[in-house]
Amino acid sequence: MARFFLEDDGKTDLANATRNDLLRRLGLVDGGGRLTNAGSLLFVETPNEGLDYIRRQVSGGDSTHRVRGGTRPLVVQFYEVEKAGEIANRLIHIPRGFVHRQIRAIPSRAFREAIVNGVTHRDWFSPDRTFVEHVGDRLSVTSPGGFLPGITPENIITHPPQPRHRSLAKAMSRMGLAEDEGIGVDRMVIEMLAVGHPRPGFAEIKGPSVRIMLFGGDPDPVMIDFLSSLNPRELSRDVDLLLVLDHLISHGWLDTGAASSATQRTSLESEEILGRIENVRVGGGELIVPVSGAPTEPSKAYRLGKAAQRRLEHRLETFRNIHGRESLILNWAKSRGRVSSTEVSDLTGVSKPYAGKLLTELADRGLLVGSRPHKMGRGYHYLPAAEESTSQPD
């Protein structure tokens, strides 16, 4: 089975090696030629139940297929679970000119990486299995053992590689089953966002166990074409750019603080990322531009450029109705500490008089307060109502 994966990954030389040489080059034998624990897991048996895959069409529905790995060699369990998942994972045809591109409802590389993560980072001393639940176009992989010390859902994308079983992770990488050590989570994020799906979810649940969630579905051909038209092109697969773009689409704007949270990087790193993305172009215009009228302190704030907004209009519809606009305004005011009609006009695309009307209505409902009693004069703006007592006079 290992040779099958190696051939599939184009590693013909390693696939044709003798058994002893293969094990040695995979790092699965010690100096005396004896199998390591990782080697035993992969090619002999798992100490407890390994993988358990279940397929359902809808949440709560009857299972239509199940693969119980038991304690068979992990490489066999992995092959059978991945094969079952591949059969159940819808293949969607995306027309592009005179050709059609085929994409799985859950991108194959993200699907594989989620399962790899569920076996390389799990607690193999636990009697619980790694449970792979495939419901519709959604995948969840729950593995026993919580996050290792220092790792949280808020830093898992950028945390230095820290596999629970390093030799197992290295062997699976060398066999072509996993990405190079330390970029598996990045790969899941890239594969999902690049076709318009939500970013993967990561959580520690009671047990403790770690759960990875992939929310697939029909790929977004507009998003795929949009990313392919970025200049420079190579940034279309840049994890930081994809995370920034995802945040802009869902929130309408971001600054260094929001970028830091979205990319899971420091403020200094986020400033560099935004500076780099400022130079990216799409459709003859900038991908992101500074928000007009917004103070540059404590940090610059950005929105999508006009060309990008036109291309991604179908994903920005929430900001075209009154509820979406009000939510954006209040989020901006709370995060930035103030909001003006110039900022609202630039963020939502409405005229300045209408932006002023929106702000007045929010103030009348007690959600905003004016920066001074009389709504006149240059620099007049609004503050979040909850922060009225801490505001400083102009």
Which residues does each PLM region occupy?
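Short alpha-helical segments that sit at the start of domains
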Residues: 220-243, 305-332
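A short, conserved structural fragment
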Residues: 254, 274-294, 363-374
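Short acidic, hydrophobic short linear motifs in intrinsically disordered regions
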Residues: 250-262, 335-348
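Short amphipathic alpha-helical interaction segments
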Residues: 263-277, 284, 350-361
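ATP phosphate-binding glycine-rich loop and adjacent ATP-lid/helix-beta elements
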Residues: 155-195, 230-238, 242, 265-275
